[in-house]
Amino acid sequence: MIKAPVVDDRPATIFLICLFYAVHMVEEFSFGFVEWGDRYFGSFDWTQNLIGNSIFFVCVALACYAYYKNPVKYLWAGMSASMWILANAFLHISATALGGEYSPGVVTATFIYVPGGLYFLNRWRTRGLLTLQNIIVPFFVGAMLFMLVPTFARAIHFHA
């Protein structure tokens, strides 16, 4: 019998990303993300925000669950969730810096998403798993497919 590599001796910690997301949503919902998003990304309302965040939350939770059940097979899913929160943080921080106004969500993005995402990447790095081969798919799935491309496509489509 071949011994499988240990990717993570505490795979349940990946669910912290779901907690990070929930706290981030509280900041966004409480401090006017929809109104801010309407100005920056065009034609944005509460229904779209709730549907979009529900879809994102389900995808992140499923990625975390898959990783939890089988970290070896679904390392890419755990890494994708981590890349997703880092990409979201990048958008909030850059929008605040470039727009010169508070982007609802930037506080949790800066103080929870960035350290949280880096925490997981560092855990994988210490196990020798943070290789170019291992991060290409998670970067494209988590950062590009689920965050950056839809955000910029929406802004271009609505001429925001």
Name every feature range the model reports, one short phrase each:
Residues 10-17, 73-81, 131-136:
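Membrane-interfacial loop-to-transmembrane alpha-helix junctions, especially the N-terminal start
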Residues 52-66, 85-89, 113:
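Core segments of transmembrane alpha-helices
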Residues 26, 30-51:
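Interfacial loop at the N-terminal end of multi-pass membrane proteins
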Residues 80-92, 105-123:
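Hydrophobic alpha-helical membrane segments
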Residues 148-160:
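Juxtamembrane boundary at the C-terminal end of a transmembrane helix
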Residues 45-58, 101-115:
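Membrane-interface loop-to-helix entry segments
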